[in-house]
């Protein structure tokens, strides 16, 4: 699912398909151990994913690896994934949930805003060597 997301929306992630395509099964397993991963399915096929875990020291969680397959967009899949990450973060005892979204990804920003996320004003480069910015969004839990 991660590789499909990187191929379809390389502009939306802090990594690339080329960097991740040769990962071993053990590397994939280790990458998800510390996070709760959600997969949305339709007719047995994965159509979306998101993960939630600790943002760092403190009581904040973070949403990462959020992606919905193009044919499933606009059908409530993104809303379901946001709700799942929020509930997971609450259950884990986080006081706040953070995420980063590419600055010009208006559809994603509107999705998060519908669920109470707000821009914090913080920005960072999407990845080294890429001049695009992503902005941080936050939701109090």
Name each region found by the language model:
Residues 1-71, 82-84, 88, 92, ...:
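Acetyl-CoA-dependent GNAT
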Residues 60, 74, 108-109:
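Internal amphipathic alpha-helical segments of the cytochrome P450 catalytic fold
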Residues 75, 79:
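Flexible nucleotide-binding loop
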Residues 95-98, 102-109, 114-141:
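C-terminal "cap" of GNAT-fold acetyltransferases
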């Amino acid at each position: 699912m991660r590789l499909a997301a990187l191929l379809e929306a390389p502009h939306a992630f802090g990594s690339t398909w080329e960097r991740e395509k040769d990962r071993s099964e053990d590397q994939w397993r280790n990458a998800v151990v510390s996070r709760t991963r959600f997969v949305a399915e339709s007719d047995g096929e994965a159509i979306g994913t998101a993960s939630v875990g600790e943002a760092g020291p403190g009581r904040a969680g973070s949403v990462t690896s959020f992606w919905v397959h193009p044919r499933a967009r606009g059908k409530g899949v993104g809303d379901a994934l946001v709700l799942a990450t929020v509930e997971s973060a609450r259950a884990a005892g986080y006081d706040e949930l953070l995420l980063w979204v590419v600055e010009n990804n208006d559809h994603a920003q509107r999705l998060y805003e519908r669920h109470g996320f707000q821009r914090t004003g913080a920005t960072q480069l999407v990845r080294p060597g890429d001049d695009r910015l992503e902005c941080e969004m936050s939701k109090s839990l």
